[in-house]
Amino acid sequence: MAKAKFERNKPHVNIGTIGHVDHGKTTLTAAITTVLAQTGQAQAMNYASIDAAPEEKERGITINTAHVEYETENRHYAHVDCPGHADYVKNMITGAAQMDGAILVVSAADGPMPQTREHILLSKQVGVPYIVVFMNKCDMVDDEELLELVEMEIRDLLSQYEFPGDDTPVIKGSAKEALDNPTGEWAKKIGELMEAVDSYIPTPERATDKPFLMPVEDVFTITGRGTVATGRVERGIVKVGDQVEIIGLAEETKNTTVTGVEMFRKLLDQAQAGDNIGALLRGVDRNDIERGQCLAKPGSVKPYTKFKAEVYVLSKEEGGRHTPFFANYRPQFYFRTTDVTGIIQLPEGVEMIMPGDNTEFTVELIAPVAMEQGTRFAIREGGRTVGAGVVASIDA
């Protein structure tokens, strides 16, 4: 059967299901597609097809992720669901599945569990900005007071991690009942959930609306014209005549003007997020700029050397280290287009980090790099990836 092509005329939002093992994340994902399929806004997916998530590689790390898509009246959604807890950790840290918001699934019969807490913490650390709660398995709980108690617990937990627990939408339902009877009473709860997601999770700012940033991949000189920096525009728009800063690696930030933009050997007036370009820079010497620096809109991003990171360390089976590492470990941190050596300080009370762990630690780089909360990086040792991380906060 041919897949119906989604019309991309609605705003696009990336979301995913998070929560403790067996609380019903995959069943809910199946229920959303099945209920929305009744109105032709999705292709119904059953539990087994979502659970058999294909393997993907992101920054050298193997992750199992299922992707489904569906529509509501107002939006087009791409939704990720992971089979195992480790897949969530890797997914969120590598940014393989960037989420504009998440649906936290909590079983009403069990209440919040260890991974519920861990996924909320991860969401905070990696910058998932909004969470909507689906209290699942409510068909198994007869006691209204118990449901209220679980809801209060969830709200408290969200507040502990600086999410607005009191204002977060909490929908009570049963994914299994909705999946088994997509036109029945429980199916209405799926409709309520999607209305909450529609209204509570804002449409993300498009990459082209953000301030200009381009990591420099290569630099060369055109005789008589000047220095050209090439790379892929990460976000924003750059026009001929724009002022930009050259940021990172050097002690000070330099200012210059883009006097030409070239793509596929054609001269353009402007380039935008996703374009691979050469930017001709006025008054910049070949030695003033190098791979690993960034061109950016003045004042939009700053270089730092010290930051706290949320990190996943590859297991031996994934090609990572075979042995743990300790404080003062000095690997390379690969930001965008280059490696910078950094020194690791472990949190208090932690003596070592084992392969396969996810953890938080502080890093001090030997040279500054343009970064902000949410910037991703890989950790490498002799060219081999041994971990992946995300900047959780900056120690200026």
Curated annotation (Swiss-Prot):
Give binding positions for Mg(2+).
Answer: 26
Reaction it catalyzes: GTP + H2O = GDP + phosphate + H(+)
Q: Where is this region: G2?
A: 60-64
* Residue ranges constituting the tr-type G domain according to the UniProt record: 10-205
Q: EC number(s) per UniProt?
A: 3.6.5.3
Role of this protein: GTP hydrolase that promotes the GTP-dependent binding of aminoacyl-tRNA to the A-site of ribosomes during protein biosynthesis.
Description of how the protein assembles with itself and partners: Monomer.
Please report which protein family the annotation says this sequence is part of.
Belongs to the TRAFAC class translation factor GTPase superfamily. Classic translation factor GTPase family. EF-Tu/EF-1A subfamily.
Which named protein is this?
Answer: Elongation factor Tu
Species this chain originates from: Brevibacillus brevis (strain 47 / JCM 6285 / NBRC 100599)
Protein's gene: tuf
